[in-house]
C-alpha cells in the first residue's frame, strides 16, 4: 500500500493522579486523557486545533487552581479539585465547544486499569471516583460516559488478562478500543485477542517488540484481521514516529498533535502534496466513530 495517509493526532490534557485514594499500585500518571482532532481536512488543520484546545485548557486549569504542574504537556490535576473525573470531562467538553470544534474533536483515554485492579477480589479501586467497581460496573460506567461525553478512544479499559469484558465493550461501545497492556505489541497476545474479538486496535511501541521485522509482522497480522495499529510516542522515539506512522498508513496516533513530532507530520504532508490524505474520523475504529465521519461528510 502506498504511504499517503496522515493519522488523527491528539494532544495531552490531563495526567492521572491519586485523586480518589489512589490505585492498588502507584498510578504513574494514569489514566491520561487527550483530545483527538479528527474533523479537519488536513493534518496541519488538526494540529492547529490541538494547539488551540491545549492552550485554552492550560489557561482554564491555571484559573481553576493556579500554576498546574505538568508531565510532558499533561496537566496534573491536584487532589480535591474535582469530585470525580466526570467534572474533568465536563470541563474538557466545554473547552472543545468554546474553541468551536464540537463534533470535530473527542476524547482519548489511556485508562491503564491494571494500576487500579485488585487481583484478590477482582475489583477496581480509586478509578474515576472513590467507588470500588466490579468489572461489570466498570463496563456499565464506560457505556454511560461514552453516551454522555465525546469519547472516541479508550485504551486498556480492563485489566490486561480480561479479554472477554474487553471484547464485550469493543462490540457495544462503538468506539476505538486499544490494547496496550492487553497486547504488549506481542503477536501471540494479539492472536488471542483476535479470536476473542477483544479491542479493535493494537498500540504499537516499537521498543517493546525487539526488532523492526517483528513489529512489521505484528502490524501485518493486525491488519489482516481488521484491527488498526496506533503508534505511540510514549518511549521517546522522537520525530521518527511520524515517518513510520505514515509508512504503515496508521489511522490514528497517540498525541503528536503539537511540537516537533507534529512538525514532522506536517513536513511529510507537504512533501506528499496532493497525494496526502488526512484520514480524519474515517481513521478511527468503531461504528460510532464512523457515524461521526458520516455526519462530517454530510456537512461538507
Q: What do the PLM-derived regions correspond to, one by one?
A:
Residues 1, 299-300:
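Accessible peptide chain termini
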Residues 1-77:
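Mobile "lid/hinge" segments at catalytic clefts and subdomain interfaces of large enzymes
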Residues 67-69, 82-299:
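Catalytic core of soluble alpha/beta enzymes
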Amino acid at each position: 500500500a502506498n504511504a499517503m495517509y496522515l493519522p488523527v493526532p491528539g494532544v495531552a490534557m490531563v495526567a492521572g493522579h491519586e485523586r480518589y485514594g489512589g490505585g492498588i499500585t502507584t498510578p504513574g500518571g494514569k489514566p491520561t486523557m487527550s483530545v483527538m482532532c479528527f474533523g479537519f481536512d488536513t493534518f496541519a488543520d488538526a494540529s492547529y486545533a490541538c494547539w488551540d484546545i491545549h492552550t485554552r485548557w492550560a489557561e482554564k486549569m491555571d484559573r481553576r487552581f493556579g500554576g498546574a504542574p505538568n508531565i510532558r504537556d499533561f496537566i496534573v490535576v491536584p487532589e480535591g479539585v474535582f469530585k470525580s473525573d466526570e467534572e474533568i470531562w465536563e470541563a474538557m467538553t466545554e473547552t472543545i465547544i468554546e474553541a468551536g470544534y464540537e463534533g470535530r474533536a473527542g476524547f482519548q483515554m489511556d485508562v491503564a486499569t491494571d494500576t487500579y485492579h485488585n487481583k484478590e477480589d477482582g475489583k477496581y479501586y480509586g478509578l474515576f471516583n472513590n467507588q470500588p467497581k466490579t468489572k461489570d460496573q466498570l463496563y456499565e460506567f464506560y457505556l454511560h460516559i461514552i453516551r454522555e461525553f465525546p469519547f472516541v478512544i479508550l485504551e486498556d479499559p480492563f485489566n490486561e488478562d480480561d479479554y472477554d469484558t474487553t471484547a464485550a465493550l469493543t462490540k457495544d461501545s462503538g468506539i476505538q478500543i486499544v490494547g496496550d497492556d492487553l497486547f504488549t505489541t506481542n503477536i501471540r497476545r494479539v492472536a488471542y485477542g483476535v479470536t476473542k474479538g477483544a479491542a479493535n486496535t493494537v498500540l504499537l511501541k516499537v521498543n517493546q517488540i525487539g526488532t523492526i521485522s517483528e513489529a512489521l509482522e505484528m502490524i501485518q497480522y493486525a491488519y489482516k484481521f481488521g484491527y488498526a495499529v496506533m503508534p505511540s510516542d510514549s518511549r521517546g522515539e522522537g520525530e521518527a514516529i511520524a515517518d513510520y506512522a505514515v509508512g504503515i498508513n496508521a489511522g490514528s496516533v497517540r498525541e503528536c498533535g503539537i511540537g516537533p513530532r507534529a512538525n514532522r507530520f506536517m513536513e511529510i504532508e507537504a512533501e506528499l502534496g496532493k497525494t496526502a490524505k488526512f484520514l480524519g474520523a474515517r481513521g478511527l475504529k468503531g461504528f460510532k466513530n464512523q457515524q461521526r465521519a458520516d455526519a462530517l461528510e454530510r456537512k461538507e
